[in-house]
Amino acid sequence: MKYAFILFSFIISFSAEAQNGRLLEMKKYFISDSSSGQLMPKEAKEELFQKAVDYYQITYLSDSFRVKGFVAIPQKGENLPCIIFNRGGNGNYNMLTNESFANKLAFLVNSGYIVIASQYRGSYGSEGKDELGGGDVNDVLSLIYTLRSIPKADTSRIGMFGWSRGAINTFLALTKVSKIKAAVVGAGFSNLITLRDTRKLLDTGLYSRQIPNYGKTKDENLLKERSAFFFAEKITKTTPVLLLQGTADKNVPASQALSLAQKFYEVKLPFRLIVYEGGTHSLEQFRSEYQAEVIKWFDNYLLDGKIFPNLEIRN
């Protein structure tokens, strides 16, 4: 009986994993002039309507949970490279909306990329619970398989783009897969311990609320498991990473990116760090500059097939 139960549990687990990424619903939506104009600056609005794009709300499976997300597909072109975007925020906080998804990612879609994003489990309309780098990492990984059902998607060319908390999901995903051709992380959480020391309320707030068992145990290992600074050597070395950081970021101090860059250097992980003097958490003051760097980074590795330079110290 014991072995039968183990076999049954294995079958259930295998079945759930096999379903990961299955696309359940894909519903087209439209960005109206009136709604988007109220939510974005003039230059962003012009960018949004610059080229023809099809926007969709999606529902897909991740660990048997129904998870919501978005996808944007350029109307022109075939066999397009893809970007998985990992949003900031947690649960319902800073969720993507029809307009904000389009606003944040229009610059990539207008450059010929399909962009797909998860709301993460536990957000409004999605099942499960956001664990801030726990099971929700599978919500990101599952999108690799969801892309197989997206029209025009070339799944041999996938990049990943995370912002703020989205850095946790991005870096953890890069410890599990090596098929991501390039990654970009902006204003990223990279050391939850030093971040907690800087923002005291994280300990009793975000960490205790979202990370299973942390509120009761205060076990710092739970924070280290979610901090790229502590698992940098496990991140695939086949994915070059672009780090973007502002020096005036109140939410994520520049020391997070600087110390992570040092760690990446030590483990010989391919990366580039760009620091924007006076840049805040969104880097809105440097919008055009950082977006140009992001496009160039993805173009290099997803379009041009560039190989990262040799990192070995030599003459």
Stretches with model-predicted labels:
Residues I31-G77:
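N-terminal cap/lid segment of alpha/beta-hydrolase-fold proteins
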Residues E78-L80, F85-G128, L192-I193:
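Short substrate-entry loop that stabilizes the transition state in hydrolases
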Residues M95, T194-K234:
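Mobile cap/lid helix-loop segments that gate and shape the active-site cleft of serine hydrolases
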Residues E131-P151:
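Alpha/beta-hydrolase active-site loop
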Residues Y145, A167-S178:
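Short glycine-enriched nucleophile-adjacent loop
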Residues I235, L242-Q245, D249:
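Short beta-strand/loop motif that positions the catalytic acidic residue
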Residues K250-Q256:
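Conserved alpha/beta-hydrolase "acid-adjacent" motif
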Residues L258-N315:
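C-terminal catalytic histidine-bearing segment of alpha/beta-hydrolase fold enzymes
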